[in-house]
UniProtKB/Swiss-Prot annotation:
The name this protein goes by in its record: High-molecular weight cobalt-containing nitrile hydratase subunit alpha
Pfam families: NHase_alpha
Keyword Chloroplast annotated: no
Organism (species): Rhodococcus rhodochrous
Subunit structure: Heterodimer of an alpha and a beta chain.
Gene encoding the protein: nhhA
Residues that span the membrane, as ranges: none
Length: 203
């Protein structure tokens, strides 16, 4: 007797069931779904956010605009849409580190960060990072924040999304915006890591 093993999580199983039903009723096609996924992974994706961060590192006027009105500043670079109708940028520095969560569901600035990672949507992350952000960053991401640095948690919602602007790594003086984007990861813009160092990438 063989035993059936469900390889999907609860949310994945629900999504698959809905997707199958829509296919059967002819409301969508697999090709259409593939195009949407490819668009968010390749055309939008976290590279948009990386360009915003890199520009803020080299352009003081843009950085100031980003601080005052991130939604408009990002829209000026072409990053706007339903999931970016109101975005606030929070800036890491030597005294403060920011981390983003959505405690109610998985609100996320898709136009600049692409598809949210599975862990961001998980109940475990959403509940634990609010109560113990420093512990979650260390245990789940191997990211140890020094005791003297304050950790602030920002709760995204349907009204407002957040993007973390990580500190510019040392040793990048003279780098172009294009080179700097390679240092900016999706995780650093959620706040579960720092930007990469020059030693961690090949420019």
């Amino acid at each position: 007797m063989s035993e059936h093993v469900n390889k999907y999580t609860e949310y994945e199983a629900r999504t698959k069931a809905i997707e199958t039903l829509l296919y059967e009723r002819g409301l969508i096609t697999p090709a259409a779904v593939d195009r949407v996924v490819s668009y968010y992974e390749n055309e939008i994706g976290p590279m948009g956010g990386a360009k915003v961060v890199a520009k803020s590192w080299v352009d003081p006027e843009y950085r100031k605009w980003l601080e005052e009105d991130a939604t408009a500043a990002m829209a000026s670079l072409g990053y706007a849409g339903e999931q970016a109708h109101q975005i606030s940028a929070v800036f890491n520095d030597s005294q403060t580190h920011h981390v983003v969560v959505c405690t109610l569901c998985s609100c996320y600035p898709w136009p600049v960060l692409g598809l949210p990672p599975a862990w961001y949507k998980s109940m475990e992350y959403r509940s634990r990072v609010v109560a113990d952000p420093r512990g979650v960053l260390k245990r789940d991401f191997g990211f140890d924040i020094p005791d003297e640095v304050e950790v602030r948690v920002w709760d995204s919602s349907s009204e407002i999304r957040y993007i973390v602007i990580p500190e510019r790594p040392a040793g990048t003086d003279g780098w172009s915006e294009e080179e700097l984007t390679k240092l900016v990861s999706r995780d650093s813009m959620i706040g579960v890591s720092n930007a990469l160092t020059p030693q961690e990438v090949i420019v």
